[in-house]
């Protein structure tokens, strides 16, 4: 199913950007890997490459640059591009904010939020899940301050608190609890945050999160269909092309 999704979205991207050759896309991806900001700037400027389409690996240029720690390219080129859309995820459903979150890059996350990144967008996981997964307390607090849903769930009912417990980060666990995280929300297999901590060898965190029973009702969460989201972006681009701003 994932392979089909990637193929479908790749076709959408290729259709919308037919003038961009696979060779040029690969060249851009390689320049990002080298953190060659000058070359990336050249490709955007001289080849008129759109910063929002997909590279051969399924990432947008910004997502890939953050993933590979090409921060010179991110800060000097990509974040300054007037056409950049920081909301566009990779074909895996990972947004730039999610990758900034898991890396604990608070400055980058603040910039992305200022530029319009959606703190609660959920293609399966949220930025708060990612921050909790790597025990990023400062990032967790930043996201919560900007309206992150503390009890957001994945399709398998995994919460940020569950991920923080799994990362064995007491500071992250406490930051989420202070914000109202519900420790009785268990995943779809009935595993609680306390169980997750115990499985990772932390009896202290497990005891801290101990509950008598899991919450029985399934938690509702709006998980966005990635295919439909990308289609809506493409339709928006088409409408803008037909009705350019004055």
Give names to the regions the model predicted.
Residues 20-64:
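N-terminal segments that cap or nucleate solenoid repeat domains
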Residues 19-27, 146, 179, 188-191, ...:
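Ankyrin-repeat-protein effector appendages
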Residues 4-12:
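Sec-dependent N-terminal signal peptides
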Residues 30-35, 64-71, 99-105, 130-136, ...:
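Ankyrin repeat A-helix N-terminal signature
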Residues 51, 84-86, 119, 150, ...:
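Ankyrin-repeat inter-repeat connecting loop/turn
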Residues 55, 88-90, 121-123, 154, ...:
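Ankyrin repeat boundary/linker residues
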Residues 36-44, 70-79, 105-113, 136-144, ...:
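Ankyrin repeat structural motif
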């Amino acid at each position: 199913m994932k392979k089909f999704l990637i193929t479908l979205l790749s076709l959408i991207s290729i259709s919308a950007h037919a003038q961009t050759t696979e060779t040029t896309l690969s060249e851009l991806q390689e320049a990002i890997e080298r953190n060659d900001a000058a070359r990336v700037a050249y490709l955007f400027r001289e080849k008129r490459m759109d910063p929002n389409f997909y590279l051969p690996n399924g990432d947008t240029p910004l997502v890939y640059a953050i993933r590979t720690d090409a921060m010179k390219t991110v800060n000097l080129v990509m974040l300054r591009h007037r056409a950049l859309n920081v909301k566009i995820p990779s074909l895996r459903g990972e947004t730039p904010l999610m990758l900034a979150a898991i890396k604990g890059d608070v400055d980058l996350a603040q910039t992305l939020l200022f530029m319009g990144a959606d703190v609660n967008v959920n293609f399966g996981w949220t930025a708060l899940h990612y921050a909790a997964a790597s025990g990023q307390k400062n990032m967790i607090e930043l996201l919560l301050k900007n309206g992150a849903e503390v009890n957001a769930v994945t399709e398998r009912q995994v919460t940020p608190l569950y991920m923080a417990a799994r990362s064995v980060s007491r500071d992250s666990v406490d930051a989420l609890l202070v914000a109202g995280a519900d420790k009785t929300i268990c995943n779809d297999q009935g595993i609680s945050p306390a169980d997750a901590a115990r499985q990772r060898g932390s009896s202290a965190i497990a005891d801290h999160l101990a509950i008598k029973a899991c919450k029985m009702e399934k938690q509702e969460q709006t998980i966005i269909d990635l295919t439909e989201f990308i289609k809506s972006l493409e339709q928006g681009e088409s409408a803008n092309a037909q009705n350019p701003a004055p």
